[in-house]
């Protein structure tokens, strides 16, 4: 070979190693995806499982790599039909195999060139050259092993080539070589052992250079502990001194990578194991550390069995086989416990490191090496555990299950976050280091070189100039640094000075190599911090161990002490995209989706766990709040009364009931209650949720706190509805006051969450409670508004209509009446002032408005029925309207009326509903006056100062505003709206108006019939009648006001007409002699007074003109006297 060929600068070893290593990873990615696709029935090429092609595939595989298309027409007939589709769909697979073959050719060529050049390899001197050389060999080896694991490789290649032959009349030009390669590498390691015989010298030299690096890295946890490894505070006096080493890049070199180099490397050049004790010791040490190696992603290689199978057929290798068996036994027995102790040490070491750096981030400058060493060590241990999790020995399974792995990952993430956050601090430090120290030392080294060729001199001078020109101002100005060119030049220089005939041999100038390696590390601290983090702490391998990943997460959540570190798992999902490669862009989407789904699942589970803890705390607090309800004090009062009256309280020895609050009395601080445990667990988990405000995974931003907020909203909604304890079958429901107490207790707990997590709990309250004021929530589920509205309408008010409950104006509540069938609830406990106020607090103005609208709908249906009754009696009522001053004629006409009792009953129902509404409105006004007094007073001013001449539309708008605030109005806007919707298209407005007038006439002339009802007796104690006819006053006034507002009539005139008719009709019963007909005459007389008192349009003077006041006075006297008599 001529001298020009051997010129190192012309061989471009550095460039070729860089390109081939990158291309090798790309090829591994593509092969890995082909293997996974072929192993998945859903993703497998359809031609491999097509029943029609089954015989053809079997024939092709059997004959592979030979091609026979002429004599097998029957078997290949189906193939002929689908040849174009096969060519199209298998092209990607086929040309990937072709690319692997070409890659192999390039690697073999480069390895031959390196052998010819007799390149010197030493990981401690020419680090980049040696590392890239060893990486290339391992990538090549892994590629061929992975290729041999694709079972369908012959079928794919053969199918494609047969389709090509049928289409083009000849085989693909690459097929003969490709087919032969597939056959040759059936047993890849065996073939490569033969292939690497000429490369043994170079490879063994590179591997033996690890003798100072690998054993130092592969120490036990006790040795690390004794050496105070990674500790910044073990020697405070040297804390500010820069962490230095002669082999800087070797300090954070992956142990996993070194073990692959050693194990595969010495298998390929196995001869050295018999002649060199150092090589043998290295190999045995690596074999004792693991049971399997990671080939690529989740593809593992069982080293002991494979090595034994390879050596068993080699003569004279019995000793090596025994060594392998001994190492296997050592690995099975001791590797698990050794790595467990390492992880235990690293947890405490990384915690210390992260804590010190968070307090003094300036130490990231001098101690940056410690950070990357810590990350690399921890990453190696995690990957070791991950690949052994599915390959663990049964004897020591506990060593392979680490429930504290989350803590280690968390501290790794914390260190990564420090590096990203304080990058500029590190840049300032190392820019000064490079310009003020490294440039000076390198310049001296170069000056002292005895021989320095021109090319090498130019490169090193450029190094010095580049470093000298650096300044802190560049960092302050935010200038982007880029030392990639300088690092590539050093890589080239390593190649130039490591060949056998180099004028300047790096082997003779080791100090130069070590100094340059240190400088390269310093440059990376300025411009490649992100790349350094990926190199030393990338855990994207978890993407391919989904089951183990999820299991670790579940273990983390189940252990309360570890739940604070659970955020580490979603953070790991941010690593996943770093495992993609540009040679396989099609997998980016798949890996991206997986990272998103896992991140989403982890955050969702964390939020659910926190939500469940909060729910448990809320349940406990609701129970404690429930103990303070007034209903629970009855027993205490009873005991006090009995004690005062010196009565026996019960049997001796009866335990005294614990009073609320006793749970807060602690006799011993060691006693931990269930509530304490829940709060501790919650604070731990919330620390994790609050750890980062957001994280970016594949260009998607995740906000952990929003997950918690979302879950709290959903659970709070369900809890509020659940706490109503509504039972549709039995029509039971919680009292509003009790629900309000529970909701307030729940809200108090939720507010305390803000002490743990920075979430806007007020937003949660607004979203949930506002939805509860509507008929349905955002998920279409019923709310407390709809539940309580239905209950009051369908249960309470229906029982009022059935005569089981009466409205007591004196108590402002509905009260159960004594009946044969006792009701399941006490109406007073649901309708008194405190309960209605609680209801108003819960439902708010919107909910109360919905309640009112529902009540009005029921009223409108009753009015519709009343109008039908009026239409039936329209002629009689028309005559009665004009004949009220003719008693005989009125009596005759009254007898012709039908459905008198129905009219009164329906009007009473309307009155009851309106009475209930007035209670609700009053409660709403009280609640709003407490919460927003100034706004309510402003609304009152609007309402009280509407000029009489104001347009009715304007007035109705003011009334609507006032009604929403719970203020009583002369005309009820909700009732007007409800009755307006009843207008019939077939009836003219004049006719509608006439029906409205006649309805009032009907009610007026029907009132005397009430006197004959036994239940119509007025009770002064309740200020009403037990059959609720006192509610007629409200019904008459509000129905009249609404109807005549709709029909634009005079409300006052119509009510005067009503009063005249009613008084005339009632005066007639004064002349009746039948005691049955007049038994409650005085009680019915009082209705007139109630109607006038209730009306804003009628006056007592007007009543006096129609009905003598003396009769009213006597009526009041009579009913009170009767009440006293009946009480006695």
From Swiss-Prot:
Q: Where in the cell is it found?
A: Cell membrane; Cell projection, Lamellipodium membrane
- The organism's superkingdom is given as Eukaryota
Q: How does it sit in the membrane?
A: Single-pass membrane protein
The reply on keyword Acetylation is yes
- The Basic and acidic residues compositionally biased stretches are 651-665
Provide the free-text tissue specificity comment from this protein's UniProt record. Answer: Expressed in all tissues examined except peripheral blood leukocytes, with highest expression in brain, heart, and skeletal muscle. Expressed in cells of various brain regions including Purkinje cells and dentate nucleus of the cerebellum, CA4 region and dentate gyrus of the hippocampus, and in frontal gray and white matter.
Q: Which UniProt keywords apply?
A: Acetylation, Cell membrane, Cell projection, Host-virus interaction, Membrane, Transmembrane, Transmembrane helix
- One GO cellular component from the entry? lamellipodium
Q: What Pfam families would the database entry show?
A: Nckap1
Q: Where is this region: Disordered?
A: 640-665
Which residues get modified to N-acetylserine?
A: 2
> Which residues are listed as membrane-spanning?
995-1015
| InterPro entries for the chain | Nck-associated_protein-1
Single GO biological process annotation from the record: in utero embryonic development
Q: How does it assemble?
A: Component of the WAVE1 complex composed of ABI2, CYFIP1 or CYFIP2, BRK1, NCKAP1 and WASF1/WAVE1. Within the complex, a heterodimer containing NCKAP1 and CYFIP1 interacts with a heterotrimer formed by WAVE1, ABI2 and BRK1. Component of the WAVE2 complex composed of ABI1, CYFIP1/SRA1, NCKAP1/NAP1 and WASF2/WAVE2. CYFIP2 binds to activated RAC1 which causes the complex to dissociate, releasing activated WASF1. The complex can also be activated by NCK1. Associates preferentially with the first SH3 domain of NCK. Interacts with NYAP1, NYAP2 and MYO16. Interacts with TMEM132D.
Family recorded in the similarity comment: Belongs to the HEM-1/HEM-2 family.
Instruction: Write out the function statement from the record.
Output: Part of the WAVE complex that regulates lamellipodia formation. The WAVE complex regulates actin filament reorganization via its interaction with the Arp2/3 complex. Actin remodeling activity is regulated by RAC1. As component of the WAVE1 complex, required for BDNF-NTRK2 endocytic trafficking and signaling from early endosomes.
Q: What is this protein called?
A: Nck-associated protein 1
Species, as recorded: Homo sapiens (Human)
């Amino acid at each position: 070979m001529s001298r020009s060929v051997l010129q190192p600068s012309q061989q471009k070893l550095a460039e070729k190693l860089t390109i081939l290593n990158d291309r090798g990873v790309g090829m591994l990615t593509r092969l890995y995806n082909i293997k996974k696709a072929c192993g998945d029935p859903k993703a497998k090429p359809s031609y491999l499982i097509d029943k029609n092609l089954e015989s053809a595939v079997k024939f092709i595989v059997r004959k592979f790599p030979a091609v026979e298309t002429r004599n097998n027409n029957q078997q290949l007939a189906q193939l002929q039909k689908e040849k174009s589709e096969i060519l199209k769909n298998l092209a990607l697979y086929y040309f990937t195999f072709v690319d692997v073959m070409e890659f192999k050719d390039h690697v073999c060529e480069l390895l031959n060139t390196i052998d010819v050049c007799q390149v010197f390899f030493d990981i401690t001197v020419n680090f980049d050259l040696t590392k890239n050389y060893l990486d290339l060999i391992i990538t090549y080896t892994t590629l061929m092993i992975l290729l041999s694991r694709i079972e369908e490789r012959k079928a794919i290649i053969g199918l494609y080539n047969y389709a090509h032959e049928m289409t083009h009349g000849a085989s693909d030009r690459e097929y003969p070589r490709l087919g032969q390669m597939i056959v040759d590498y059936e047993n890849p390691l065996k073939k490569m052992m033969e292939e690497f015989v000429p490369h043994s010298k170079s490879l063994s030299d590179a591997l033996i250079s690890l003798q100072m690096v690998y054993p130092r890295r592969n120490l036990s946890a006790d040795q690390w502990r004794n050496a105070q490894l990674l500790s910044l505070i073990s020697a405070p006096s040297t804390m500010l001194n820069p962490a230095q080493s002669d082999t800087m890049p070797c300090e954070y070199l992956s142990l996993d990578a070194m073990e692959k180099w050693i194990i595969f490397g010495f298998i390929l050049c196995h001869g050295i194991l018999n002649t060199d004790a150092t090589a043998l010791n290295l190999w045995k040490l690596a074999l004792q550390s693991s049971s399997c190696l990671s080939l690529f992603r989740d593809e593992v290689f069982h080293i002991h069995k494979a090595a034994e199978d390879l050596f068993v057929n080699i003569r004279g290798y019995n000793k090596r086989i025994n060594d392998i068996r001994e190492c296997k036994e050592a690995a099975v027995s001791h590797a698990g416990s050794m790595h467990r102790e390492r992880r235990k040490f690293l947890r405490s070491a990384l915690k210390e490191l992260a804590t010190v750096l968070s307090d003094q981030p300036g130490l990231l400058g001098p101690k940056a090496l410690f950070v990357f060493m810590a990350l690399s060590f921890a990453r190696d241990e995690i990957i070791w555990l991950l690949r052994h999790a599915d390959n663990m020995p049964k004897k020591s399974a506990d060593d392979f299950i680490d429930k504290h792995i989350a803590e280690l990952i968390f501290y790794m993430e914390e260190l990564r976050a420090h590096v990203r956050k304080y990058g500029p601090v590190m840049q300032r430090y190392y820019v000064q280091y490079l310009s003020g120290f490294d440039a000076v030392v390198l310049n001296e080294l170069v000056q002292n070189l005895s021989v320095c060729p021109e090319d090498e001199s130019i490169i090193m001078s450029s190094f010095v100039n580049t470093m000298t020109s650096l300044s802190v101002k560049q960092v302050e100005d935010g200038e982007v640094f880029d030392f990639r060119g300088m690092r590539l030049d050093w890589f080239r220089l390593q190649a130039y000075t490591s060949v056998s005939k180099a004028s300047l041999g790096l082997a003779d100038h080791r100090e130069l190599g070590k100094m340059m390696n240190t400088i390269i590390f310093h440059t990376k601290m300025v411009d490649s911090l992100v790349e350094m983090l990926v190199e030393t702490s990338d855990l994207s391998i978890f993407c391919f161990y989904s089951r183990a990943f999820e299991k670790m997460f579940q273990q983390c959540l189940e252990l309360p002490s570890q739940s604070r570190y659970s955020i580490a798992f979603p953070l790991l999902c941010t690593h996943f995209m770093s495992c993609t490669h540009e040679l396989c862009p099609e997998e980016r989407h798949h890996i991206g989706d997986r990272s998103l789904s896992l991140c989403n699942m982890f955050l969702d589970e964390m939020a659910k766990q926190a939500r469940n803890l909060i729910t448990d705390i809320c349940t406990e607090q609701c129970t404690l709040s429930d103990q303070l309800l007034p209903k629970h004090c009855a027993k205490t009062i009873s005991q006090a009364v009995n004690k005062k009256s010196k009565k026996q309280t019960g049997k001796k020895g009866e335990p005294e009931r614990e009073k609320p609050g006793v749970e807060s009395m602690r006799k011993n601080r060691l006693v931990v209650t269930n509530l304490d445990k829940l709060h501790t667990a919650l604070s731990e988990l919330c620390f994790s949720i609050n750890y980062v405000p957001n994280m970016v995974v594949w260009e998607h931003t995740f906000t952990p706190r929003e997950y918690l907020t979302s879950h709290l909203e959903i659970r709070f909604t369900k809890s509020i509805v659940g706490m109503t304890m509504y039972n549709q079958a039995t029509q039971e429901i919680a009292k509003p006051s009790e629900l309000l107490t529970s909701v307030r207790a729940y809200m108090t707990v939720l507010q305390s969450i803000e002490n743990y997590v920075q979430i806007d709990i007020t937003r949660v309250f607004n979203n949930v409670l506002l939805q509860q004021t509507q008929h349905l929530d955002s998920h279409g589920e019923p709310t407390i508004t709809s539940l309580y509205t239905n209950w009051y309408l369908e249960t309470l008010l229906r029982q009022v209509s059935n005569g089981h409950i009466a409205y007591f104006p004196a108590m402002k509540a509905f009260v159960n009446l004594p009946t044969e069938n006792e009701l399941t609830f006490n109406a007073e406990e649901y309708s008194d002032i405190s309960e209605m106020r609680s209801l108003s607090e819960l439902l708010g103005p919107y909910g109360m408005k919905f309640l009112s609208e529902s009540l009005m709908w029921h009223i409108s249906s009753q009015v519709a029925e009343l109008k039908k009754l009026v239409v039936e009696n329209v002629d009689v009522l028309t005559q009665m309207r004009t004949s009220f001053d003719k008693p005989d004629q009125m009596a005759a006409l009254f007898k012709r009326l039908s459905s008198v009792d129905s009219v009164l009953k329906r009007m009473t129902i309307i009155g009851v509903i309106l009475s209930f509404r007035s209670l609700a409105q009053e409660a709403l006004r009280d609640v709003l006056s407490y919460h927003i007094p100034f706004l309510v007073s402003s609304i009152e001013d609007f309402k009280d100062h509407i000029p009489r001449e104001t347009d009715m539309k304007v007035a109705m708008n003011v009334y609507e505003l006032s009604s929403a605030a719970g203020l009583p109005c002369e005309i009820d806007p909700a009732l007007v709206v409800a009755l307006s919707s009843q207008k019939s298209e077939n009836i003219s407005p004049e006719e509608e108006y006439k029906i409205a007038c006649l309805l009032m006439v009907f009610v007026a002339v029907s009132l005397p019939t009430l006197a004959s009802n036994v239940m119509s007796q007025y009770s002064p104690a309740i200020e009403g009648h037990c059959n609720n006819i006192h509610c007629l006053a409200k019904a008459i006034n509000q129905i009249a006001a609404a109807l005549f507002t709709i029909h634009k009539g005079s409300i006052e005139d119509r009510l005067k007409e009503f009063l005249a008719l009613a008084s005339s009709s009632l005066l007639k019963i004064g002349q009746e002699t039948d005691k049955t007909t007049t038994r409650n005459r005085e009680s019915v007389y009082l209705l007139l007074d109630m109607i006038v008192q209730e009306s804003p349009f009628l006056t007592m003077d007007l009543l006096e003109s129609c009905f003598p006041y003396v009769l009213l006075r006597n009526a009041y006297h009579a009913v009170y006297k009767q009440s006293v008599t009946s009480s006695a």
